[in-house]
């Protein structure tokens, strides 16, 4: 531990700029996550309602991430993609926190961002020693004070009785 350092902060703005990656490695990881979640392609077809969407799969290798398409995607596939993306980001944060904890006794945090849709903060909060939030209120926006108050209430709930910081 270093003098003057009182806490570690893992990566910044997980899921921002951009939140999604559709590269071949992420596509393979998505299929592996689906295999873990559903066990086989028939359970995936049932969960996703693929008969209705004319997207029935015969092998998990046929499943691609819901990248740009001419129409809207299967909503169940999008939900699982969001869950997968959150899982990947959270796994990265947890790996960074684990490394920090191996070398330091200082608390670990990362910045949440109010109501940020790319991550499930309820799942993330238990992996952190201290919940923290970024806030960038626009002084010209009359609703900004309400948004900051709402985010503070959310952080207090996520902290579960533990301290949290802004």
Regions found by a protein language model. Name each.
Residues 1-148:
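Polysaccharide-binding and catalytic clefts of secreted carbohydrate-active enzymes
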Residues 105-106, 159-163:
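A short helix->loop->beta-strand "cap" motif at the edges of active sites that frequently abuts
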Residues 119-122, 152-158:
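Short amphipathic alpha-helices and their capping/turn segments at secondary-structure boundaries
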Residues 134-135, 163-166:
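Aromatic/acidic polysaccharide-binding cleft in carbohydrate-active enzymes
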């Amino acid at each position: 531990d270093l003098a003057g350092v009182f806490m570690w902060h893992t990566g910044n703005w997980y899921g921002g700029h951009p939140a999604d990656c559709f590269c071949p490695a992420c596509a393979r990881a998505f299929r592996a996550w689906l295999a873990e979640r559903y066990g086989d392609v028939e359970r995936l077809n049932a969960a996703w309602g693929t008969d209705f969407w004319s997207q029935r799969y015969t092998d998990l290798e046929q499943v691609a991430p819901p990248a740009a398409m001419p129409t809207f995607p299967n909503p169940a596939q999008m939900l699982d993609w969001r869950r997968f993306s959150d899982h990947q980001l959270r796994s990265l944060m947890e790996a960074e926190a684990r490394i920090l904890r191996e070398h330091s006794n200082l608390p670990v945090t990362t910045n949440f961002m109010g109501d940020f849709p790319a991550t499930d903060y309820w799942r993330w909060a238990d992996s952190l020693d201290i919940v923290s939030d970024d806030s960038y209120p626009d002084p010209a926006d009359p609703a900004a004070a309400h948004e900051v108050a709402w985010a503070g209430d959310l952080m207090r709930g996520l902290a579960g009785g533990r301290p949290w910081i802004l």
